[in-house]
């Protein structure tokens, strides 16, 4: 069942210097994005967020994705306390959760910044829910897996954002947009990033406006290949 006529998407940056992040945030805000996910590193994330906020304004949401590079609970909490005054919408995988979830639960108890494990395995999502170790999930995979994982999160009262495609091209972007449209609790801007390509091969048919992409209504995926 389709739940959304348009789906939220966020701006995105790879690891950069703080000034480069700020320039991208300014560009993202000009293009109408409300949220910016960035590949964060512990040595410059505080300066990065400060400069991004100055460049894009205090309402510009930032999702911090360290890819585990914050290292441990202590460092993650230290950085969270320095960042809590900004519009930080989530920490995505700040440090390793294996072999158990107790330190993720401890993080949640000590800071208001939402914590997001990036998981595709349904059993791992269930274990994180049971351990009270997550506020939301970053998930994806096949359509079946995505719907199962999102359904478990919804039953637990949690939103998700989807990484079904990532840095693909326009056809896969259209596919990801349709998947997003049928996930009721996919309320966090997704990582469908075909529009960042110089040429997405569909002639810019799914360009975001004000941080949303319209779900195509035409038959099939609803887009056509630009053969030129």
Locate each region found by the language model.
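N-terminal capping/lid subdomain adjacent to the active-site entrance of alpha/beta enzymes
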Residues: 1-77, 81-85, 202-228
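Hydrophobic faces of well-ordered beta-strands that scaffold small-molecule active sites
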Residues: 7-14, 34-38, 60-66, 91-92, ...
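Short, small-residue-enriched loops and turns at beta-alpha junctions
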Residues: 15-18, 41-45, 66-74, 90-99, ...
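Shared catalytic-loop signature of beta/alpha-barrel
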Residues: 81, 87, 98-114, 119-219, ...
């Amino acid at each position: 069942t389709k739940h959304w006529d348009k789906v939220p998407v966020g701006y995105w940056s790879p690891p950069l210097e703080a000034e480069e992040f700020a320039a991208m945030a300014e560009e993202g805000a000009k293009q109408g994005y409300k949220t910016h996910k960035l590949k964060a590193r512990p040595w410059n994330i505080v300066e990065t967020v400060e400069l991004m906020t100055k460049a894009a304004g205090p309402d510009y949401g930032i999702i911090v994705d360290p890819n585990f590079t914050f290292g441990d609970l202590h460092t993650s909490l230290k950085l969270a306390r320095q960042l809590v005054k900004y519009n930080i919408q989530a920490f995505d995988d700040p440090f390793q959760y294996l072999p158990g979830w107790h330190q993720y639960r401890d993080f949640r108890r000590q800071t208001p910044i939402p914590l997001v494990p990036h998981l595709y395995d349904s059993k791992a999502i269930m274990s994180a829910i049971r351990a009270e170790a997550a506020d939301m999930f970053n998930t994806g995979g096949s359509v079946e897996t995505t719907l199962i994982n999102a359904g478990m999160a919804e039953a637990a009262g949690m939103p998700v954002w989807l990484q079904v495609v990532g840095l693909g091209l326009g056809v896969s972007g259209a596919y990801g947009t349709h998947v997003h449209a049928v996930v009721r609790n996919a309320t966090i801007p997704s990582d469908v990033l075909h529009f960042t390509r110089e040429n997405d091969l569909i002639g810019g048919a799914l360009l975001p406006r004000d941080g949303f992409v319209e779900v195509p209504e035409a038959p099939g995926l609803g887009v056509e290949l630009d053969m030129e």
